[in-house]
Amino acid sequence: METTTTPLLPGDRSRCGWLRRRLRLKNPLSSELSGAVGDLGTFIPIVLTLTLVSNLDLSTTLIFTGFYNIATGLLFDIPMPVQPMKSIAAVAVSESPHLTPSQIAAAGASTAATLLLLGATGAMSFLYNIIPLPVVRGVQLSQGLQFAFTAIKYVRFNYDTATLKPSSSPRIWLGLDGLILALAALLFIILSTGSGNDREAEDGDLAETSSNESQSRRRRLRLLSSIPSALIVFALGLVLCFIRDPSIFKDLKFGPSKFHILRISWDDWKIGFLRAAIPQIPLSVLNSVIAVCKLSNDLFDKELSATTVSISVGVMNLIGCWFGAMPVCHGAGGLAGQYRFGARSGLSVIFLGIGKLIVGLVFGNSFVRILSQFPIGILGVLLLFAGIELAMASKDMNSKEDSFIMLVCAAVSMTGSSAALGFGCGVVLYLLLKLRTLDCSSVTLFSRSSDESQVDSEAAPRDV
């Protein structure tokens, strides 16, 4: 009896090819895994603080953000980060009274609905195309430097989870979260990754030297760059959690928390929108969509659709916030951090998403006991490299005018702690400089031609 095989339909073949492309490594596996943890310097402190202060459901947050990582890794084919909405988190824990989980969810859903509306109507794509590049670079520079400043404070001072800020007491030199540990992690990452150059760029530089010397240096640099430095440092931090507090083993409970839909009252919507969503919306538009699209073009030579990124942020939060998950967005700082430590494909964040799912399903809310003992100095080191990588995206501002706009925008953003304020000043400055160099002769010629045409029309005989 003959057996026949049915070939794949064209649509099935194209879908399989699309999935294979999305699941293809663009860097060695060790580098992709190292890059996957490159943005945890911001993720862990904010999640830990919201869990301890605002009673955030950690298990639900890990499960939903794990699904987000997997979905965005497949959708965008780059290490698209999933990070907390920082302005909402800051308001939730630093202002009195603290926001409740329902109010945090209302703020996240309000921000998400705004970004979804901007993306669906095409307004986000319009903004992306008309905003001057020096202004975007100014926002990126200010965000990167703010990350770096915060990272240095994490390394130098003890961390206060009640305020989401470093405390005034300096960090001790010795100990399992001391300065020596943080400095050792810093030196290890610098020696293994250098300034963050790609291998191709390093090979091009070495090609100009003598052949024997360049070959030995190339082998040494390839060996160093193959070390998953961020992954090793993060794994060391996890081990130190159990050494610092062995009672963690007794407090761990297996299984996720029960899913439930939050009850959000009208007062929760009002408080969440007025106190947290209003300052978050401009930051999400600038840093989570526009800056991410610009940075992806710089790092991966891939132009992302501002519409797709905006809708992605909207859909994620309109689903997860109703179950108590932390409001999240895509951040340029997280993208820069993951790229800095070796992530080049969407498979990197897929690995991260799988890890979050496993932790959320196995340990649930008890995982906060582990996070509470994680050395903050190590997180500061990871955050420092992410901030520097984001700030270095502004290196393409070659003209003095572009650099002037960028620096003014960054200075205002950092002084007022508001990316929206710096963005507004940058746009006004850009328009003033363009108005200053506007060719007035064209305006004069146009006015003269209009006057002459008016005289000719008056002199022409009218038909009776």
Swiss-Prot record:
One of its GO terms (molecular function) is molybdate ion transmembrane transporter activity. The chain crosses the membrane at residues 33-53, 62-82, 116-136, 172-192, 223-243, 309-329, 348-368, 374-394, 404-424. Keywords: Membrane, Molybdenum, Transmembrane, Transmembrane helix, Transport, Vacuole. One of its GO terms (biological process) is molybdate ion export from vacuole. GO terms for cellular component: mitochondrion; plant-type vacuole; plant-type vacuole membrane. About 80% of the leaf molybdate is exported during senescence. Belongs to the SLC26A/SulP transporter (TC 2.A.53) family. This is Molybdate transporter 2. The lineage of its organism: Eukaryota, Viridiplantae, Streptophyta, Embryophyta, Tracheophyta. The gene is MOT2.
